[in-house]
A protein has these predicted regions:
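Cell-envelope/extracellular polymer assembly enzymes that use nucleotide-activated donors
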Residues: 3-5, 34
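Short, well-formed alpha-helical segments that are part of the catalytic scaffolds
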Residues: 13-27
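C-terminal catalytic/acceptor-binding lobe
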Residues: 19, 164-241
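Acidic donor-binding segment of Leloir-type glycosyltransferases
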Residues: 25-65
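Glycine-rich, basic loop-to-helix element that forms the pyrophosphate-binding segment
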Residues: 69-84
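Short beta-strand-to-loop acidic/aromatic patch adjacent to the donor-nucleotide binding site
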Residues: 88-98
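Conserved donor-nucleotide/metal-binding helix-loop-beta segment in metal-dependent transferases, i.e.
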Residues: 102-123
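Short beta-strand-to-loop element that shapes/binds the nucleotide-sugar donor at the catalytic cleft/hinge
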Residues: 121-137
Length: 241
């Protein structure tokens, strides 16, 4: 059994965080070695509320929760949380997603085990990719499952698109060694973006370009497992540093 640590980044949105964790608890079917949450709100009130809430949501896991005393930005928070990981795989998660189908980690392993240059597998629906194009050719992988012993996974590779190789901080499985190949993320980002950028897309693009230069790519399943629920409650990214 390949060990997986969940790393979840949050920023004070406890209502969305609760929905995210509850849906993960309901639909995840793979054993989790550790569950790490790092909150970057810098808000003591949020920290006090989370201290009361999270032990119940995470009672089934060996869990660790960290609060930044003042905001550091998502990227520094990710680098810190990843530095605490001692498992070969990370399931990255943010605080504004809702899962609705099972076996997303097992199915991701089926693809990643067969392709060492697959940086991650997207779990969104095909019509929910922010217009990121995919290859027309589809691929099939059979897998055993109790309810579907002859089931087939259909997926597509994502095309390189305006510098994007497919890397994203959206929910998804990734190898710890692939992170360590370029770690920390902050060294690949312009200084103006490291603390608290106005657009996280710029950060993802810079990291995606780096992985693309190393030959990595991403894939997406024909059927999705998760939806974004945070559009109307986006974190206001203003530095307090």
């Amino acid at each position: 059994m390949k060990e997986v640590t969940v790393v979840l980044t949050s920023c004070g949105r406890l209502n969305l965080l609760t929905k995210t964790i509850r849906s993960f608890n309901k639909f995840n079917t793979y054993p989790i070695s550790k569950f790490i949450i790092i909150d970057d709100s810098g808000d003591l009130t949020i920290h006090e509320e989370a201290d009361k809430l999270l032990p119940f949501l995470l009672e089934d896991y060996d869990h660790f929760v960290f609060f930044n005393n003042k905001r550091k930005g998502q990227l520094k928070s990710i680098d810190y949380a990843y530095s605490l990981v001692d498992t070969p795989y990370i399931f990255h998660l943010e605080d504004d997603w809702e899962f609705y189908r099972t076996s997303f980690i097992e199915h991701s392993f089926k693809l990643m085990d067969n392709d060492p240059k697959l940086i991650t597998v997207w779990l969104r629906e095909l019509n929910d990719t922010m217009n990121h194009p995919r290859y027309k050719e589809s691929n099939f992988v059979t897998y055993p499952a109790e309810d579907e012993p002859l089931a087939i996974l259909k997926y597509y590779y994502l095309k390189e698109y305006k510098g994007w190789s497919g890397f994203s901080f959206n929910p998804g499985l990734r190898r710890h060694r692939d992170y360590k190949t370029i770690s920390p993320f902050t060294k690949h980002i312009p200084d103006k973006l490291v603390n608290i950028p106005e657009s996280l897309l710029e950060i993802e693009l810079a990291i995606s370009k780096k992985y693309g230069d190393l030959g990595f790519k991403a894939a997406i399943f024909e059927k999705g497992y998760v939806r974004h629920i945070g559009w109307e409650n986006t974190t206001k990214l203003k530095s307090t540093i």
